[in-house]
UniProtKB/Swiss-Prot annotation:
This is Putative flagella-related protein F. It is a lipid-anchor. Residues 1-18 form the signal peptide. It comes from the Archaea. To M.voltae FlaF. It comes from Methanocaldococcus jannaschii (strain ATCC 43067 / DSM 2661 / JAL-1 / JCM 10045 / NBRC 100440). The gene is flaF. GO terms for cellular component: archaeal-type flagellum; membrane. It is found in: Archaeal flagellum; Membrane. One of its GO terms (biological process) is archaeal or bacterial-type flagellum-dependent cell motility. GO terms for molecular function: structural molecule activity. A lipid is attached at C19 (S-archaeol cysteine). Its main location: other. Keywords: Acetylation, Archaeal flagellum, Lipoprotein, Membrane, Signal. The keyword Ligase does not apply.
Length: 139
C-alpha cells in the first residue's frame, strides 16, 4: 500500500510539472506577442505625435495644383505614402508627382512640392502615413 501511494504521488507531481511547464511556455509566448504589439503601437503613437507638417504654399490653375509642404516636426516622413483629397475626393496616384523627384523622404526642416494634375480644388486635405490630416482652403 505504501509503494502505490508513493508512485501515485510521483505521477501526480510529474503531471503537475509538465502542465506547469506547458502553461509557462504558452503564457510566455502570449505576453511576448502582447509586448511586441504594445511596442509597435507606442512607436506609431510617438511618430504621430511628433509629426508636424505645414502646407506653406498652394499654386493652383485649372488643371494643375502645386502644394508645398514643410516638415516642422521631428519625424522623417515619406511623401509618396500621403493620401491627397481634393474637395473630399481622393486623387489617384498616377496624377501625383513630386518635386524634386529624387526626394523619397521628407526630413525635418525641409520642404517638398507635390504636383497634382487634377481639377482645381477649393479644399485640400493631405493625410499622412501616420494618420494625421492637414487642411488647406483656397477660398
Amino acid at each position: 500500500m505504501g509503494f502505490s501511494s508513493v508512485v501515485g504521488a510521483t505521477v501526480m507531481i510529474i503531471a503537475l510539472l509538465v502542465c506547469g511547464a506547458y502553461l509557462y511556455v504558452t503564457m510566455d509566448s502570449y505576453y511576448e506577442n502582447v509586448d511586441e504589439a504594445y511596442t509597435t503601437y507606442y512607436s506609431h503613437v510617438h511618430a504621430k505625435l511628433n509629426e508636424k507638417l505645414v502646407i506653406t504654399d498652394v499654386k493652383s490653375s485649372t488643371s494643375q495644383t502645386n502644394i508645398t509642404i514643410y516638415n516642422n516636426g521631428s519625424v522623417v516622413v515619406e511623401p509618396d505614402k500621403f493620401t491627397i483629397l481634393f474637395d473630399g475626393t481622393v486623387v489617384p496616384e498616377e496624377n501625383i508627382s513630386y518635386y524634386p523627384k529624387l526626394k523619397k523622404y521628407l526630413v525635418p526642416l525641409d520642404s517638398i512640392t507635390i504636383v497634382v494634375n487634377w481639377t482645381q480644388p477649393s479644399r485640400i486635405c493631405i493625410v499622412s502615413d501616420n494618420g494625421n490630416k492637414y487642411f488647406y482652403s483656397l477660398t
